[in-house]
């Protein structure tokens, strides 16, 4: 890439091949133009990632114009594609690893019509390290190495077969590992055979890295729906709503959630801490000089009050659970709430999918912890066990803020590009996509938004977003916004994905890694190497230490290179 503040040029290489390995055509710049047009015309699920980034694209997607030539993506020649952006985006290059920006050959697209991109190997063209050989639903996926791939020397595994696993037989993975069918097997600490597996592989059970997913508890500050509730009177509803609007009350809950106990319900006690996360933006997501993002957030957080002193925001440990702090904050909140006529106990409805046993156990763990810390004469957690459809409809798939039928919910967010804004902007008070989880509408609830300070949060985001030349200053400003979010406790960070146990013959840290895009996901096998014997803890830990050191240097180098080529 030759990047600048409002545009970038990308040079092309490689050729298209069919599933049989036959050459189809060269990859050309026009294929990238066709790719965006195809995604736009077919309402691609990730369109929001680029819709307001590329000049003219939003007008095309929303129907203001049907002339795609007005969109800021052009083929300058056969091998150079140019993107014109609507605004400066220092993180633009990291967006290009998302499939929404991948190329599509127009001739092939027309030949396949509605069959394009279906689940048959011949429905797409290939120019990556592998060709899809077979896809059998709920059975297996098979890949073979693409011999024509430009970087084929770095692809050491000739064939890949993925077996379908629905989680019902947790002993199956280790059986297939021992028989040689699997190169990697998940190990489940809560399964019936874990003790036996641990005894046999005590030196070989290793834990995956935490990923980019951030899970958290969040409050609904403007609840309108009460179809699933334990509350029996309007007074109880009003008391809960007033309590949730009180920052001391929210902070009390934040300090009272035992995240380790919650995680243990699905990950087991031994692995419970390995998936914990204390920030919305992963603490090592970006570097600010010689400090991690999380370290800078910590320095900002203490400015909000002494209760935040000594808080460790690193991953894989609970930075918040503190019974004494929780009770002190609750005492402050109770005085303030009683002066407003609030009656106790405060009833908090928390929905959960009743078919997800781990989730039910987790919510019951939260109930037990909070009622123990505060006493059930002060707070009662009412776990609402709902059908899968009902749970989706009151939470993740709720059509509007007013349909969110809960007081407290467990939700999550995944970053799309290498900038803190990907985690923080969705909650801005003007047009944030996920403002709705608080039960808020940007236009209808301005007064409530201001009373919560979300207008201040939005101002912090704007100030950070306006800094496009000095990356360190930009990230530091976003750290201020993250600190505000922690102090406000509308969102209470809890855990990530990853941190899971396995036995494996995959040589540690030989596969690609990225917190954004598809290049670092679990289905990228370029660079990966296998070894004869299972990986040991010692081997894994030594490789991890070396990788972390090299990763930090690579991030610093990348940020310096960005600063040097801004036009």
What annotation goes with each model-predicted range?
Residues 133-148, 163-232, 260, 264-269:
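Extracellular/periplasmic solute-recognition and catalytic clefts
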């Amino acid at each position: 890439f030759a990047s600048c503040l409002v545009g970038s040029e990308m040079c092309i290489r490689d050729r298209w091949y069919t599933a049989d390995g036959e050459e189809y055509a060269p990859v050309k710049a026009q294929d990238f133009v066709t790719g965006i047009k195809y995604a736009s015309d077919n309402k691609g699920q990730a369109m929001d990632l680029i819709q307001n980034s590329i000049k003219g694209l939003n007008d095309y997607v929303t129907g203001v114009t049907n002339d795609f030539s007005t969109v800021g993506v052009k083929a300058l020649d056969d091998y150079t594609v140019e993107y014109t952006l609507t605004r400066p985006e220092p993180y633009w290059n990291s967006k290009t690893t998302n499939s929404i920006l991948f190329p599509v050959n127009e001739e092939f697209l027309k030949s396949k019509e509605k069959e394009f991109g279906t689940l048959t190997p011949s429905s797409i063209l290939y120019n990556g390290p592998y060709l899809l050989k077979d896809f059998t639903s709920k059975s297996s996926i098979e890949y073979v190495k693409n011999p024509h791939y430009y970087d084929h020397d770095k692809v050491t595994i000739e064939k890949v077969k993925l077996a379908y696993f629905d989680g019902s037989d947790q002993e199956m993975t280790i059986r297939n590992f021992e028989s040689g069918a699997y190169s990697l097997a998940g190990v489940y600490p809560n399964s019936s055979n874990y003790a036996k597996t641990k005894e046999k592989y005590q030196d070989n059970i290793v834990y995956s890295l935490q990923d980019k997913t951030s899970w958290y508890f969040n409050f609904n500050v403007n609840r309108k729906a009460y179809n699933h509730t334990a509350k029996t009177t309007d007074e109880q509803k009003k008391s809960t709503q007033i309590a949730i609007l009180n920052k001391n009350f929210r902070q009390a809950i934040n300090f009272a959630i035992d995240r380790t106990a919650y995680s243990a319900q699905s990950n087991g006690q031994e692995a419970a801490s390995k998936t914990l996360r204390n920030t919305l933006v992963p603490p090592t997501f970006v570097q600010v000089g010689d400090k991690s993002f999380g370290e800078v957030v910590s320095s900002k957080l203490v400015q909000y009050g002494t209760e935040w002193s000594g808080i460790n925001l690193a991953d894989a440990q609970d930075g918040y659970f503190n019974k004494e702090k929780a009770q002190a904050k609750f005492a402050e909140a109770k005085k303030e709430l009683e002066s407003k006529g609030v009656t106790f106990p405060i009833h908090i409805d928390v929905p959960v999918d009743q078919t997800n046993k781990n989730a039910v156990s987790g919510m019951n763990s939260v109930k037990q912890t909070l009622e123990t810390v505060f006493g059930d004469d002060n707070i009662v957690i009412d776990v609402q066990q709902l059908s899968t459809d009902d749970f989706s409809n009151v939470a993740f798939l709720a059509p509007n803020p007013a349909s969110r039928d809960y007081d407290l919910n467990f939700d999550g967010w995944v970053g799309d590009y290498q900038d803190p804004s990907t985690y923080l902007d969705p909650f801005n008070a003007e047009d944030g996509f996920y403002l709705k989880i608080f039960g808020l509408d940007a236009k209808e609830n301005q007064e409530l938004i201001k009373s919560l300070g979300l207008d201040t949060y939005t101002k912090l985001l704007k100030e950070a977003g306006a800094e496009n030349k000095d990356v360190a200053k930009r990230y530091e400003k976003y750290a201020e916004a993250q600190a505000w979010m922690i102090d406000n406790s509308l969102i209470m960070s809890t855990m990530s994905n990853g941190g899971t146990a396995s036995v494996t013959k995959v040589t540690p840290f030989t596969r690609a890694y990225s917190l954004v895009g598809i290049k670092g996901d679990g289905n990228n096998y370029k660079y990966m190497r296998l070894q004869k014997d299972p990986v040991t803890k010692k081997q894994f830990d030594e490789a991890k230490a070396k990788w972390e050191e090299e990763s930090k240097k690579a991030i610093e180098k990348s940020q310096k290179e960005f600063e040097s080529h801004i036009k």
